[in-house]
Amino acid sequence: MMTMWCLTLFVLWMLRVVGMHVLRYGYTGIFDDTSHMTLTVVGIFDGQHFFTYHVNSSDKASSRANGTISWMANVSAAYPTYLDGERAKGDLIFNQTEQNLLELEIALGYRSQSVLTWTHECNTTENGSFVAGYEGFGWDGETLMELKDNLTLWTGPNYEISWLKQNKTYIDGKIKNISEGDTTIQRNYLKGNCTQWSVIYSGFQTPVTHPVVKGGVRNQNDNRAEAFCTSYGFFPGEINITFIHYGNKAPDDSEPQCNPLLPTFDGTFHQGCYVAIFCNQNYTCRVTHGNWTVEIPISVTSPDDSSSGEVPDHPTANKRYNTMTISSVLLALLLCALLFAFLHYFTTLKQYLRNLAFAWRYRKVRSS
């Protein structure tokens, strides 16, 4: 037991040292009210949404596969058939998903919406070694079956949920009917193709850089002002800047205005937003970049308060200000006294020297 614990700690330490990449694909098939099916595939690498495939059964010819981040242009340049291959793969998966949706809707019944999800994920080290994998299928937001841990055994859902419990026989039968060969194919994919592409993506990927955020108040006039919030140096360029007032988003009549998203010379981006607000109110600027969020408090005082020379909520600063004022007055009085004394002394000395010179001349005249 102790040996396994030490081995687990060692593996976790190694992952921390060498780093780890996570490549995940999520497939979502949906039947709408008109029995048309849509399939959307989303690729995420290290938290960056890099790929999307979409098709609708009403127009299969319009299926499209697109890179959704700047470094995917380099992947497409290095592998010219990449997007065509992903589109062809998506078209095949669409046909399988349509059949599975029909089967599940008949077996499990129509609920709030007929939604089939499928996720697979592989975790690799920086040097391309496979660490862990995952395969899972879900229906209407609940997991039906999963392949994880050592990737040899499929497990079922949480049967405490009533509608899953009602269909336990069907679900257990589906899991039991998964052949060892099918499981091997999934395992080999996660350890092979998925891991290989994770290494390829890591060579083209631009690392995530979260922004430096600054907020404050400007253009203050009477009882109105602008609260601004600017984010610098972030990548990728997808960012959300909102203003929160008393725990809620800014009201509709004061929606924030955002400047265009602009690139910088180092490949990152910056963007600023502002909102018109009343004075004597507290706002919070909330910036979300991927799974990273920061909040900057912004307080606005009225011009009357700011012109009084007082610093709100800082009595120590007020006391320091008063002390400095008194010291300045005393110093000025002392300098005036010294200047007066010097002028008085200089005038007296000048008069004394003049009298002394006159007496010397008078003595010299009498002696002659």
From Swiss-Prot:
Residue spans crossing the bilayer: 326-346
UniProt KW keywords: Glycoprotein, Host membrane, Host-virus interaction, Immunity, Membrane, MHC I, Modulation of host NK-cell activity by virus, Signal, Transmembrane, Transmembrane helix, Viral immunoevasion
Signal peptide segment: 1-19
Main location group: host cell
Location in the cell: Host membrane
UniProt topology in membrane: Single-pass membrane protein
A GO term from the CC aspect: MHC class I protein complex
GO terms, biological process: antigen processing and presentation of peptide antigen via MHC class I; symbiont-mediated perturbation of host natural killer cell mediated immune response
Keyword hit for Hydrolase: no
Pfam family, one: MHC_I
PANTHER family referenced in this protein's UniProt entry, alphabetically: MHC CLASS I-RELATED, SHKT DOMAIN-CONTAINING PROTEIN
Assembly: Interacts with host LILRB1.
Its job: Plays a role in the protection against host NK cell cytotoxicity by interacting with and modulating the activity of the host inhibitory leukocyte Ig-like receptor 1/LILRB1, which is expressed on monocytes, dendritic cells, as well as subsets of T and NK cells. UL18 exerts an inhibitory effect on LIR-1+ NK cells, while it stimulates LIR-1- NK cell.
Name of this protein: Membrane glycoprotein UL18
Record lineage: Viruses, Duplodnaviria, Heunggongvirae, Peploviricota, Herviviricetes
Designated gene of the protein: UL18
